[in-house]
Amino acid sequence: DSVPLYYNDVRNFGTFKIALSKNALDKKINSLGPDFLKDGWGPDTFYNLLKKKPNKTVAEFLMNQKNVSGIGNYLKAECLYDAKISPHRFCCHITTKESDRLFYACRRIIQLSYQTGGATIQNYRKPNGKKGLYSQRFAVYNQKTSPCGNEIIKEQTLDKRTTHWVPAVQK
């Protein structure tokens, strides 16, 4: 049976590849870092992964799907804010306590985003045509002030993406 496949990437951030064999698919999947939505790994593994990238900023680390998978730009901003970590910090300077905070922030925020259908940014829609509701919960991404009233800075970080962050909170 033939099944139509639709791919709409209005923001031009995505890629679409077709694996022609199970081996090709397995190779790609095995190249990805651990998924925050899956059990079987935890804060100790996360800390060890961070320490393997001492010369990368935490923003670069989170956005590289070979390190950890499932984090995009809005999740990066929200998770770093929740963990109170600056996107400019290098992985080698992240303490165990900070790494634990970041791991649990990522897991919690990604789960909540997934449960609420993701974030509708611009004209994004889920396959059923509905908007994701997580954008209504943004603390810093696309906001002017943080929940505690601090100014949010928007700047390009070393991951080459615009990052929303709060210097008064994130150290």
Show the residue positions of the predicted features.
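Structured catalytic/nucleic-acid-binding cores of DNA maintenance enzymes
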Residues: 1-171
